[in-house]
Amino acid sequence: MGYEAGQYDVIVIGAGHAGVEAALASARQGAKTLVLTINLDMVAFMPCNPSVGGPAKGIVVREIDALGGEMARNIDKTHIQMRMLNTGKGPAVRALRAQADKFQYQHEMKHTLEKTPNLTLLQGIAERLIIEDGECRGVITQTGAEYKAKTVVLTTGTYLRGRIILGDLSYSSGPNNQQPSIKLSEHLEELGFDLVRFKTGTPPRVSSDSIDYSKTEIQPGDPVPRAFSYETVEYITDQLPCWLTYTSPETHEIIDSNLHRSPMYSGMIKGTGPRYCPSIEDKVVRFNDKPRHQIFLEPEGRNTQEVYVQGLSTSLPEDVQQRMLATIPGLEKVQMMRAGYAIEYDAIVPTQLWPTLETKKIPNLYTAGQINGTSGYEEAAGQGIMAGINAGRKALGKEEVILSRSDAYIGVLIDDLVTKGTNEPYRLLTSRAEYRLLLRHDNADLRLTEIGHDIGLISDERYEAFEKKKAAIEAEKKRLWSVIIKPSPENQEYIRSLGGSELKDGVRGTDLMKRPEMNYETVTKLAPADSPVPQDVAEQVEIQVKYEGYIEKSLQQVEKLKKMENKKIPDRIDYDAIKGIATEARQKLKEVRPLSVAQASRISGVNPADISILLVYLEQGRIAKVAE
């Protein structure tokens, strides 16, 4: 027998990286929020790599922070090592990456949820949604408890009909042998959602005491203090190193001779795996000309012996994994503590979502994270905060928020999912962003803090500090533009010492900074400020001045895009009434139901000729008929 158990504004099902951000975003806006999860000991658990950030992903973490989310603050408090990647390249591809103490990370995040007003945590298994008049109105648990809500967010990760595969062993399970969610997946199919089967994998964990580190290369963290959050002022200094080693020809020989026992090659695994995180079996087969592959040994925390063997994701049988490990330098006598495995799970086809992450089929139902076909904690968290913002705003009767492709990597991620869909676990890459010079690690606050403040996730105090920073950047740019650096003997000698050509006349500080050999530090030695300039302000001044021309070109492209984004398409347009559009384009337009001409132009299978016909009809107002 069912029973009424409670009434909420928002219910979030699942408390992984998407779920915690969704719940916090909802509750911090003032929406009464319930988090329902299978196991409260697994809040924000890291079932795969113990790290946060990296190319594109690290920028997403900064964006989450600029919007008022939690991932950045949490990793700043719980990391064991932090490094800035791609420092030798331009600012568009620089990214921060942290090794996490995975246990401290989840405990700290759970504590944050527990002390957040308007937020209730509950252990339980959601089996069905409450659907009234075609709209989602709550959830029913395994025990028959009925929780009503104005909106519901599904953040189920890899739990939907999860199945672990290890050699010829296969059993129903969520990640790390957690209980899977079977009935909810079946219920989504009953409701008419199209589901796909995806797969991911994880490598073995080994005991640190059994590693011979003398045969590996140390990988220390950066000596310079780093942080993801713009609010962090206290930095962890006692960092732990990671270690680099390599597979050997013997490793590859063992893999080759046991491919018949690999679930990937025997046909046992049906789900599609992530292209950018292949298993070691896949790497050895696809790149058989490579004599070795990198293996990083990453501690899983400060108070555990477990070490994550990055680069050795596998579902080969346990005995093969043990033999494989023993052929890797430094791991000859290693003790395997946990075997690697593959996990298959259900995901929904993401073109069934609006850009708000609300489902088209069932109003008031939102989805975020791996259920939408993505891979990675950061991609999940980025979707989670947007789903939580929008579910909360809809429940409170406010207008929902959509980030564009020029606003944030989160905008690129969501637009790719809902417009193009994905036939494999989606990973965010810098190459997916057209405006990556605008979407940098260093300027996430300048792009998104105002939005976060308007939503109510950024405090007035933090917003005032942000406004002061913006003003300081403009003031310093103005000062350097107005100051003239003269060709005095001392100045000429200094410029020559940097490898630059002498000045012919006096030059503005900003113009001098655009020279390849000059930067903010060198220019301000010739034209020092009256008082010290904060490092983050100096960094912005240098990037905005040195890359001014490129940034201006990108901004012009964004303006063109905005014109197309502003050409809205009526929600109930009848594409069958538009003559001349190709059959494939018509089918795709009907499936995706784009909100604007710009979004329509990004749909796979919709060509410029189809867009031209659509524009003519829209501009002439010839579409009077709409689909019933």
Swiss-Prot record:
GO terms for MF: flavin adenine dinucleotide binding
This protein's GO CC annotations: cytosol
Intrachain disulfide bonds: none
Binding site for NAD(+): 273-287
GO biological process: tRNA methylation; tRNA wobble uridine modification
Cellular compartments annotated: Cytoplasm
Entry keywords, A to Z: Cytoplasm, FAD, Flavoprotein, NAD, tRNA processing
Primary subcellular site in the record, as a coarse category: cytoplasm
Keyword Phosphoprotein found: no
PROSITE patterns documented for this protein: GIDA_1, GIDA_2
Cofactor(s) the protein needs: FAD
Function text: NAD-binding protein involved in the addition of a carboxymethylaminomethyl (cmnm) group at the wobble position (U34) of certain tRNAs, forming tRNA-cmnm(5)s(2)U34.
Quaternary data: Homodimer. Heterotetramer of two MnmE and two MnmG subunits.
Family classification: Belongs to the MnmG family.
NCBIfam families listed in its UniProt record: mnmG_gidA
Name of this protein: tRNA uridine 5-carboxymethylaminomethyl modification enzyme MnmG
Organism annotation: Bacillus velezensis (strain DSM 23117 / BGSC 10A6 / LMG 26770 / FZB42) (Bacillus amyloliquefaciens subsp. plantarum)
